[in-house]
């Protein structure tokens, strides 16, 4: 199997602490770059676990369309700013951060007090602007999850009236692009490919770690296929019907037909079900009249046999 190398050719950290990594993977057989690129992109964009703000409580506020006295931003703006926070929580359970601030003050993400298990990636992210003589109290809920989780309106009705739910985006990877370079040529002129992949994260994880986690998920997905053992199912023998157990004597056949069948080792209806009309005619001293008699007797108990034997 062709061995390829992975090289990170660029790594950048933006002002908002988001990270961009560019990777070159190759050489690959033709078609493998597309397979790798599509598989990694799908897991990177929707399969990685991340952290997100899921709810906010604002003192004195019980709905998202309100305004806060002495605060420049309305509630919707504050919720949006909280939703856009890049956060990394190592706690699988709910984490709650708190903020109590007095104006004049521009509240930033770093002003929110969390436990040591929560890291705010972009501490300079603005949250709200408080005017002099006014206060702002926030409670911010952070959870871990995968993908996108919209607000559940049914559960929202059972939560505290002042806890404002937020559509949660747990995806730590913001964008993935890849291109395929088909110019690489191996010895002997065989065509090769290289995969160039750009991964942009929100800063809560690095592009290197994101690709490693995506690859591990794909390995776990495909690993069972490598050890699949195909077990041939042996079909169960169908249970004979009650009619098949009827002895030959109970068909009330003529003495001639009965004796001919007995000499042919036919002792029950089950034995007769293996015969066709043509097979009956081949029994010694068994004519068409006797064959018709057998057919009629079988039909009386709901059993029919084919007119001719099945060709193999």
From Swiss-Prot:
Superkingdom: Bacteria
Signal peptide extent: none
UniProt-recorded Gene Ontology molecular function terms: DNA binding; DNA-directed RNA polymerase activity; protein dimerization activity
Entry protein name: DNA-directed RNA polymerase subunit alpha
InterPro entries according to UniProt: DNA-dir_RNA_pol_insert, DNA-dir_RNA_pol_RpoA/D/Rpb3, DNA-dir_RpoA, RBP11-like, RNAP_asu_C, RNApol_insert_sf
Quaternary structure annotation from Swiss-Prot or TrEMBL: In cyanobacteria the RNAP catalytic core is composed of 2 alpha, 1 beta, 1 beta', 1 gamma and 1 omega subunit. When a sigma factor is associated with the core the holoenzyme is formed, which can initiate transcription.
Chain positions covered by the region annotation Alpha N-terminal domain (alpha-NTD): 1-229
Domain comment (free text): The N-terminal domain is essential for RNAP assembly and basal transcription, whereas the C-terminal domain is involved in interaction with transcriptional regulators and with upstream promoter elements.
GO cellular component: cytoplasm; DNA-directed RNA polymerase complex
GO annotation, biological process: DNA-templated transcription
Primary enzyme class: transferase
UniProt function note: DNA-dependent RNA polymerase catalyzes the transcription of DNA into RNA using the four ribonucleoside triphosphates as substrates.
Entry EC no(s): 2.7.7.6
Region (Alpha C-terminal domain (alpha-CTD)) location: 240-312
UniProt KW keywords: DNA-directed RNA polymerase, Nucleotidyltransferase, Transcription, Transferase
Species this protein is from: Prochlorococcus marinus (strain MIT 9301)
Swiss-Prot/TrEMBL catalytic activity: RNA(n) + a ribonucleoside 5'-triphosphate = RNA(n+1) + diphosphate
Family affiliation: Belongs to the RNA polymerase alpha chain family.
Coiled coil: none
Gene it is expressed from: rpoA
CDD domains attached to this UniProt entry: RNAP_alpha_NTD (cd06928)
